[in-house]
Structure formats: C-alpha cells, structure tokens
Amino acid sequence: MALHKSANIPAPPDEVWDLICDWAGMLRWWLTAEEGGLQGPALVTCELIGEHDSVPRTRRMTLGNGIVVDEQIFYQNDETQRIYYRKSDDQSLTGYIASTYVDEIEGGDCASHISCMFDVRDPADRAPAAARFEAVYAAMFEGYRRYFTRTTAG
C-alpha cells in the first residue's frame, strides 16, 4: 500500500524542519486525545536511541497500552529537508517505509508532506491500516500547526 498526505503549516520551513528532525521531541507537539489528537492509546514516552542529528537514529515510542514502536531515520538531507525512516513491524503491518519533507510556500509558510509504503499481513486489513495512518498523519499535521500557533502567540 502507498499513501501521501500534505498540509500547510503556518511557520517557516526551517523551523518546521527543526521540529521534525527533533526525532524524540514528539511530546512537544503531539496532541492528546483530549486536545483533539488521535484517539486510542496515549503516547506516554518518546526516547531517542542514538545521537541527536546522527543517522541512523531511532525514536522509541511507548503507548499507554504498553505497545512499543520504534521508528528509525536511515536518511536525512538537511538541504532538501527530507528524511526517510522505517517503522518496526507489528502483528498486522510489515515493511513500513516513509519519507517526510518540507516545502516553502507563498508567504513564508510551508507545506509538510508524508509519503509511505507498507504491506499488510491480511488483505482485509488494508482499508483499516490506511485509515489509521491517515488519522496519524492528520494528528501530526494538527500538532505541528498548534505547536507553531502556541509558539508565535508567546
């Protein structure tokens, strides 16, 4: 399966890029379900494995239900503002590879993009998996927007 989602973020591209590359800094911008974020188990911790700005580096996310998810950056280009990363396999998904990148748009703001490919173990899981990732990406984009709205508001 393949997905691509984009959203405009009201912030300069370099600032959004810095936020994205702070690989274990998700708790700064990730919205809780109560704040309008993703429904389901809460993100409890996000720790960095490796050095900040090193490639590879991994973020280990622990959810409220005890599930642990690792995402590892294996390519980062600060000039083109693009990363490639992989997510650890789970009981329903394998081979998740994604790219996140930032483009400047008119007015000094930016667009953030996420493209991914993955396999599902059971063909019946295709639509639910796509819907889940689309919800995750929408929550990420909204978290970025609110982070920069709070930051500029003081």
Regions found by a protein language model. Give the residues of each.
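Hydrophobic/aromatic beta-strand elements that line small-molecule binding cavities or substrate pockets
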Residues: K5-A7, V69-Y75, I97-E104
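Beta-strand/loop substructures that line and gate deep hydrophobic ligand-binding cavities in soluble
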Residues: R86-A139
